[in-house]
């Protein structure tokens, strides 16, 4: 059974473990700790009591930015990322947020397809933004209009 709840400070070690497993260039523990507080809307998705995914989002006035989302590799391809994003979008709409922004690696075709299926559109590209093992790659900036 899947449950979505707030990502609390006490949940950060489990989220950090997922971050390490899910991303080739993961955030540091310090970055994780600094993305908590009242201006953040952070969620976790647990499956049978174990954290399987998380999302970290900053809300400023009527805009939000999804800073990080990850699904544990053992739980990928089960629709958990979609469920977490749909929950986030619903919560942002309740708060009157007009636009949700995110950036994604140009090579992350699965994530781009998910975002597009939820209504995100490409806004711009940041050239050579992300590090790779052999250089840099572009970030695609995407936006989802939520409410007016």
Curated annotation (Swiss-Prot):
SUPFAM superfamilies: Acyl-CoA N-acyltransferases (Nat). Its EC number is 2.3.1.266. Disulfide bonds: none annotated. Acetyl-CoA binds at residues 69-71, 108. One of its GO terms (molecular function) is protein-N-terminal-alanine acetyltransferase activity. The active site is at 103 (proton acceptor), 115 (proton donor). It catalyses: N-terminal L-alanyl-[ribosomal protein bS18] + acetyl-CoA = N-terminal N(alpha)-acetyl-L-alanyl-[ribosomal protein bS18] + CoA + H(+). It is found in: Cytoplasm. Its main location: cytoplasm. The keyword Acyltransferase applies. It is an enzyme of class 2 (transferase). NCBIfam families: PRK09491.1, rimI. This is [Ribosomal protein bS18]-alanine N-acetyltransferase. It comes from Escherichia coli O157:H7. The lineage of its organism: Bacteria, Pseudomonadati, Pseudomonadota, Gammaproteobacteria, Enterobacterales.
């Amino acid at each position: 059974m899947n449950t979505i709840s707030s990502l609390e400070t006490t949940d950060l070690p489990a989220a950090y473990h997922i971050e390490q497993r899910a991303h080739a260039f993961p955030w540091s523990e310090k970055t994780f700790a600094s993305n908590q507080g009242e201006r953040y809307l952070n969620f976790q998705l647990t499956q049978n009591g174990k954290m399987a995914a998380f999302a970290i989002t900053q809300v400023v006035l009527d805009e939000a930015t999804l800073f990080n989302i990850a699904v544990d590799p053992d739980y990928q391809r089960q629709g958990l990322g979609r469920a977490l994003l749909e929950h986030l979008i619903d919560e942002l709409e309740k708060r009157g947020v007009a636009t949700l922004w995110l950036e994604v690696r140009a090579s992350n075709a699965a994530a781009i397809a998910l975002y597009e299926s939820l209504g995100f559109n490409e806004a711009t590209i940041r050239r050579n933004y992300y590090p790779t093992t052999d250089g840099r790659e572009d970030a695609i900036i995407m936006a989802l209009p939520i409410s007016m």
